[in-house]
Regions:
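Short alpha-helical DNA-recognition segment
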Residues: 20-38
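DNA major-groove recognition helix of helix-turn-helix/homeodomain DNA-binding modules
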Residues: 50-65
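Short, charged recognition helix plus adjacent turn
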Residues: 68-95
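A short glycine-rich, His/Asp/Glu-containing loop-to-beta-strand
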Residues: 85-124, 180-185
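Short acidic-glycine-tyrosine-enriched beta hairpin
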Residues: 147-161
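Double-stranded beta-helix
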Residues: 171, 176-191
């Protein structure tokens, strides 16, 4: 947990400084309190997934930027396993593995998400033009789109504009696992 908090802290501070934003300005852009942003930057607080999404959206950067460091090398071919990457964000009943962090050459990030039984998350709209590609690889889940929960059985896939309120839930007694490829229309170049 210490390493993760340190990564959150260093990344948040670096992005904020690159934008030349004060904590007040960052708070306005993200909807996260100045106090909470300061605690994260000092490594004193572990943000929830919902908070990380708000921060990523406010800074116009990819969520995966905060999950793990960008690879130092520029390898196009490398094997990654979800098992070694999977993490549980603090106070969220969801597991997350950043399969591919955001790369500006491709314009997307790919995340594996595991929803525990009974988990539900409503996501705020992403930046204009963002598209999500959800592929259910294990179990059944539901996806909220246009105010309606759509059943997503194992093996199903859905692409949708994610610049609106949407959500994910698992009403079953077994975990549901899905891959989410998020294509960003634009990402701030000074991320």
């Amino acid at each position: 947990m210490e390493d993760r908090n340190q990564h959150f802290a260093v990344t948040l501070k670096a992005i904020r400084k690159a934008k030349k934003w004060s904590l007040d300005r960052a708070s306005q852009a993200t909807g996260v309190s100045k106090a909470m942003l300061g605690q994260i930057e000092r490594g004193e607080s572990s943000p929830t997934l919902a908070t990380l999404w708000k921060i990523a959206e406010g800074f116009e950067t990819a969520l995966s930027t905060f999950i793990e460091p960008k690879p130092a090398d520029n390898q196009d071919a490398r094997v990654r396993t979800a098992t070694e990457l999977r993490r549980k964000p603090v106070s969220d009943d969801m597991l997350m593995a950043s399969m591919f962090t955001y790369d500006e050459r491709f314009g997307f990030e790919m995340i594996e998400l595991t929803l525990m039984p009974g988990y539900e998350r409503i996501a705020d709209p992403h930046e204009q033009g963002t598209t999500e590609h959800v592929i259910v690889v294990k179990g059944d889940m539901e996806l909220l789109l246009n105010g309606e929960w759509l059943p997503m059985p194992e093996g199903s896939a859905l692409r949708f504009a994610a610049d609106c309120i949407h959500g994910y839930r698992n009403l079953n007694d077994q975990p549901a696992v899905f891959h989410n490829l998020i294509h960003h229309a634009k990402i701030s170049p000074d991320r």
